[in-house]
Amino acid sequence: MVMSAYPSIRERLFRLAPVASTESVPVLCIRFLLILMSLLVIGVMIAFGVKPVGMWMHRHRFILGASVIAACVLLNISGSSIGMWNYWLGHDMSTDVVWGTPRIMRTDEYVVGTPLAFSQSYSGYSYFNDLFGNKPADMFIVKDAPVLALAELFRPFHWGYILFGSSRGLAFYWSARLVVLFLAAYEFFLCISNDRRQEKHKGVAFVGAILIACAPLVQWWFAVNALPEMLIAIFVSIVCFDRYLGDTESGHRAAYAAVILICAGMFALTLYPAWQISLGYLLAGLILCIVIRHWGHIRISRKDALIFVGEIALFCVILGSAVVTSWGTIQSMHTAYPGARQSIGGGLPPLSLISSVGTLFFPFKDYAVDSVTTNMVEASRFVDLFPLGIILAVFGMIKRKKVDVLSAWLIAVIALFSVFACVGMPLWLSKIMMLTSVTSGRCVVVLGVANIAVLVRAA
């Protein structure tokens, strides 16, 4: 209603008339290149075969990923809905849009997050910014904006703003997170597949990575609450932990440990307990399963231990610097929200657990709200094909007459959070299980990731 009424209000109150749409030459060229590249990939696969091309892309996946990021930064391509400002100011909101349409619902991105990130260039990327409110605002903890601080090491996707400026920094922020999320999910699914030599499950891992990176839930929430960072931190840390235990060279282990600690800092600084706690259950089980996989072959030398202790100390110093600087902000966060939340779950319609495929169509048609969800963002899901993964996993364990620890843990996580989200539990039990900060609607993230993981594992 607001969107339909706004044009007349804009013209009468602000004297702003809509401007005719014009397609710029750069936008048309970018569209042509995207279509050309897609057709080129299809043509190469037809000419040389899907498997050889797929293996070539697998071998060069990191170079290809870096090339995509570089191209997006060079061409200033992002997924921001900042074009909505053209609409509010009486212009054509499709101006400079290569594909899709700006989403009015993503106000927390184009009204809050992106403008705050841009504002940092006017303060020299300072930790506190006095452009908002009656006192300097903590841009690192609350605003999740780029700052020049040691702890920014744990937020590598902000580096583009500092290195390239606001426009190309925004392009880096969007493209790097999507590419890295896809590659991290791909490596993770290769790691947890039943094929330890990772030769037969590349196609399955590719499909799993698509289901994660292109999930409706991930895309609707892409620019807020750091969901991609949480998933990247989990996937990369598990892959590095697996390689840490399987490698004996101290230099390699030092690098793996450093990446794991960066992921730990990234996960901690997302500061969204509703997702962090539920995903923490998943992470704990994955760590345990990796230890079981390498049990009996784990060797930690004194040199490895000393290096790891040194890296832990450096990690604590860097993270501690942010805690000390933002101590007042952190104390405030433990008052009304999220510190005072006392969730007991319940209220999620069980039917929503098996209706994830329908959320693929949300971008094409407005979603009719019901009593539980209020918009397309809240109703979005991972296309996890529940309960297919569980059925395949159970059938496989029965056929092999052997319990698969990882599949069993994933099924247990799915069962726990399905009951918590749909039925609920007493407050005392919710406190014991540290779920009071987790709402029913936010459980769909861990459910989606766990369902996709068990599906890939069982394939």
Task: Give residue spans per PLM region.
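Hydrophobic cores of alpha-helical transmembrane segments in multi-pass inner/ER membrane proteins
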Residues: 34-46, 233-242, 278-290, 314-319, ...
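Membrane-helix boundary/interfacial segments in multi-pass membrane proteins
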Residues: 18-23, 168, 172, 217-229, ...
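Start-transfer (signal-anchor) and selected internal transmembrane alpha helices
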Residues: 27-80
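Aromatic-rich transmembrane-lumenal/periplasmic boundary elements in polytopic membrane proteins
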Residues: 65-139, 304-364
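Membrane-interfacial entry segments at the cytosolic side of transmembrane helices
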Residues: 54-63, 251-255, 295-313, 402-406
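Active-site lumenal/periplasmic loops and adjacent helix-entry segments of GT-C-fold
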Residues: 82-232
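Membrane-embedded helix bundles of polyisoprenyl
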Residues: 182-191, 201-294, 304-329
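Periplasmic/ER-lumenal interhelical loops and adjacent helix-loop junctions
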Residues: 17-25, 321-402, 406
